[in-house]
Amino acid sequence: MESWLIPAAPVTVVEEIKKSRFITMLAHTDGVEAAKAFVESVRAEHPDARHHCVAWVAGAPDDSQQLGFSDDGEPAGTAGKPMLAQLMGSGVGEITAVVVRYYGGILLGTGGLVKAYGGGVNQALRQLTTQRKTPLTEYTLQCEYHQLTGIEALLGQCDGKIINSDYQAFVLLRVALPAAKVAEFSAKLADFSRGSLQLLAIEE
């Protein structure tokens, strides 16, 4: 994906169902480790809750390698899975949902739990504000000092930026560009430098 929506700010929704209190929290989490860290922070904040059920889409919305969920002691399939289904249906990436349940003494049944956990995430998603994320690819570029201002201007025109500059006899730049803008920037760079400058891919 060239770009996707991510949460712009955290959301918390509180709901009481048959004396059980459900607190649904959504947050931006860039990667699985960030998702796990958010879950742990919620656990620390609500240590006395009976359940801390979890779902995350930790990468791009279509990245199945970064999905996760946990029922945390609720009957299998009644919490994490319906929560994840709501997240996946939203089209938002880099997002984690935690639903904290304080048990009120009345059993909700399988259908009731699915509705409570999935419904909590659905309500929170309706309140969520998002922003668009465009991932950038990094390249190196070597130029003369007098060319630097021109290159900065070209990067600005193509939604790119300079990540790092190393000043020696020449300037070695590490730049980042959206994938969709690389060809345009390369063409402008060739025109600007009369073919003397080119982007070099960074080898992993």
Curated annotation (Swiss-Prot):
Signal sequence residues? none
Q: Which Pfam families match?
A: DUF1949 (PF09186), UPF0029 (PF01205)
Entry GO CC: cytoplasm
**A biological process term (GO) from this entry:** regulation of translational initiation
> Gene3D superfamilies per the record?
3.30.70.240, Impact, N-terminal domain
For this chain, one GO molecular function annotation is: anion binding
Which superkingdom?
Bacteria
* PANTHER family listed in its UniProt record: IMPACT FAMILY MEMBER YIGZ (PTHR16301:SF20), IMPACT-RELATED (PTHR16301)
Quaternary structure note:
Monomer.
Please give the family membership noted in the entry.
Belongs to the IMPACT family.
Q: This protein is called what?
A: IMPACT family member YigZ
Question: What's the source species for this entry?
Answer: Escherichia coli (strain K12)
Give the source lineage, highest ranks first.
Bacteria, Pseudomonadati, Pseudomonadota, Gammaproteobacteria, Enterobacterales
Q: Which gene encodes it?
A: yigZ
